[in-house]
C-alpha cells in the first residue's frame, strides 16, 4: 500500500485554495439565506472547468484564477445575494 501523500503543483494548490475559500464564503452566505444555492453553483462551475480545460493550459488556468479571486472578493461583500448567469442565444 502506497502511503506517500499526493504532491500538488503550486497552481493546483492555488486552485484548491480558491475552491475552499469559495465554499467557506458560500456556506456563510447560505446560513443567512437557506434557499440560496451558491455552493451548488460554485461546485458545478469548478467541475465544469476541470473537465473542459486541459491541465497543460497554464495560461487559461492562471487567468481563471485571477477572475475567481475577483469573484471571491465580490461574494464576500455583505450586499451580495447570488450570481447572475447570462446565457447567450444560439444562432
Swiss-Prot record:
Q: Which UniProt keywords apply?
A: Chaperone, Mitochondrion
Q: Does the keyword Amino-acid biosynthesis apply?
A: no
**GO annotation, cellular component aspect:** mitochondrial matrix; mitochondrion
Q: What is its main location?
A: mitochondrion
CDD domains tied to this protein: Complex1_LYR_SDHAF1_LYRM8 (cd20268)
Superkingdom as given in the UniProt entry: Eukaryota
Q: Mention any Pfam family matching this sequence.
A: Complex1_LYR
Query: Which ranges of the sequence are coiled-coil?
Result: none
Q: What InterPro entries does this protein map onto?
A: Complex1_LYR_dom (IPR008011), Complex1_LYR_SDHAF1_LYRM8 (IPR045295)
Q: Where in the cell is it found?
A: Mitochondrion matrix
What name does the UniProt record give this protein?
Succinate dehydrogenase assembly factor 1A, mitochondrial
The taxonomic lineage of its organism, from the top, reads: Eukaryota, Amoebozoa, Evosea, Eumycetozoa, Dictyostelia
Amino acid at each position: 500500500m502506497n502511503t506517500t501523500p499526493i504532491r500538488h503543483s503550486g497552481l493546483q494548490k492555488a486552485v484548491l485554495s480558491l475552491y475552499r475559500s469559495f465554499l467557506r464564503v458560500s456556506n456563510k452566505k447560505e446560513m443567512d439565506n437557506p434557499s440560496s444555492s451558491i455552493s451548488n453553483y460554485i461546485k458545478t462551475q469548478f467541475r465544469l472547468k476541470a473537465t473542459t480545460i486541459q491541465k497543460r493550459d497554464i495560461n487559461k488556468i492562471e487567468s481563471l484564477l485571477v477572475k475567481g479571486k475577483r469573484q471571491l472578493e465580490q461574494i464576500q461583500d455583505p450586499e451580495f445575494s447570488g450570481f447572475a448567469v447570462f446565457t447567450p442565444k444560439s444562432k
